[in-house]
Amino acid sequence: MRKFSVLMITALLLSGCSTGEQPPIAAPGVIPSCDQIDISKETSEVLKMSCLDGSSEINYHSIKGPIIINVWASWCTGCKEEMPYFVDLYANPIFKSGEIKLLGIDVDEKNADSGPNFIKSNGMSWPHLEDTDSRSKLVFGPGVPVTYFLDKSGEVIHKHIGAYRSKSQLYEAVEKYFEVKL
């Protein structure tokens, strides 16, 4: 974890500034673009993943916060159970304004269409990356779901292993770790 923090700090020191402009939210049934995710301009190629809309690649270590990163898979029972809570959370004005961002990472799919179909059928209108070769396990570990909260400096301020069991549990974590009122 210390090595991860050092990498994140290094990436942030090398980062540029965001314009603060937010692209429009994707319509239901559309795979959203990853353009709204703030990233550093210079970073190593340690963990590069493709955006599920096919528009770009993003190196995980270049992602800036504040952001919630939810690692999921379409076949995962816990992921299916908690996804409505994330859909509801993303509708909150704090996320719509870009004050806090949400990023999904789809892992361990057997079929290339599974992740995009899951996103569309569940109304997941935030950006998603796909890990097609399981390299994300080096950072996030082997199990799903797992959710990370990163602060403005890119530091992990909270890690939740397993599914959120209620909307209130997820909301309470967001309010506590990002010091916001939803």
Give the location of each predicted region:
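Structural microenvironment flanking redox-active thiols in thiol-disulfide oxidoreductases
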Residues: 80-122, 132-138
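A short beta-strand-turn-helix
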Residues: 46-67
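Hydrophobic beta-strand anchors of alpha/beta hydrolase catalytic cores
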Residues: 68-69, 102, 147
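Active-site-proximal beta-strand/loop segments in catalytic clefts of secreted hydrolases
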Residues: 71-73, 105-108, 131-133, 160-162
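Thiol/disulfide oxidoreductase modules built on the thioredoxin-like
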Residues: 117-124, 130-182
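Short pre-active-site segment immediately N-terminal to redox-active cysteine/selenocysteine motifs
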Residues: 65-67, 72-75, 143
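N-terminal targeting signals for export/organelle localization
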Residues: 1-50, 172, 182
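Extracytoplasmic
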Residues: 42-44, 63-64, 97-100, 142
